[in-house]
């Protein structure tokens, strides 16, 4: 991204493009190593930064480098409130477990339990990432096929939502 962005943005602007998104990693890097975000203050069109933007401070750093905005990707997996924090709102959840349970409820309402339960395993893993005993929790969740059992596992892990969802 940092190798030829300036020339590509100039060509795009000359062709009528009104803004562009710049990812801070090259294709060869994949997800390895930190994203590199060049200063784009002199770009002829607004540039949106993408890659390794996980906090409000990361977004502020991009603004300081001349970016018109940010595009958040993997950082919101298991932490959807990050978007509010980047927007300047104090939205740290009091109980992540309640958010996970609400997310599970919405998934079941939308997809039905037979689809939602296996699909939700990855979400439970993202929400629990980095927490004590999360490895054991993920192993347990990946064996669950029943909505109430999944609800109970989430409730137990986060210490919330003692009532099952009745499915």
Predicted regions and their residues:
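Short, solvent-exposed loop/turn segments at secondary-structure boundaries
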Residues: 2-3, 31-35
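Alpha/beta catalytic cores of nucleotide-metabolism and tRNA/nucleoside-modifying enzymes
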Residues: 4-19, 42-49, 53-167
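Glycine-rich, proline-tolerant flexible connector loops at the mouths of alpha/beta enzymes
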Residues: 22-32
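Short, intrinsically disordered, charge-balanced linker/junction segments flanking boundaries
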Residues: 37-40
């Amino acid at each position: 991204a940092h190798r030829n962005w300036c020339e590509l943005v100039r060509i795009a602007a000359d062709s009528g493009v009104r803004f562009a998104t710049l990812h801070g990693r090259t294709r060869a890097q994949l997800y390895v190593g930190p994203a590199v975000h060049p200063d784009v203050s002199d770009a002829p069109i607004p540039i949106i930064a993408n890659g390794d933007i996980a906090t409000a401070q990361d977004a502020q750093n991009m603004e300081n480098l001349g970016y018109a905005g940010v595009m958040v990707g993997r950082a919101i997996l298991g932490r959807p409130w990050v978007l509010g924090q980047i927007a300047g709102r104090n939205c740290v959840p009091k109980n992540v477990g309640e958010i996970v349970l609400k997310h599970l409820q919405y998934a079941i309402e939308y997809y039905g339990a037979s689809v939602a339960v296996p699909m939700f395993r990855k979400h439970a893993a993202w929400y629990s990432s980095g927490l004590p005993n999360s490895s054991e929790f993920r192993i347990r969740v990946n064996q669950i096929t029943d909505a109430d059992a999944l609800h109970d596992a989430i409730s137990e892990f986060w210490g919330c939502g003692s009532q099952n969802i009745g499915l």
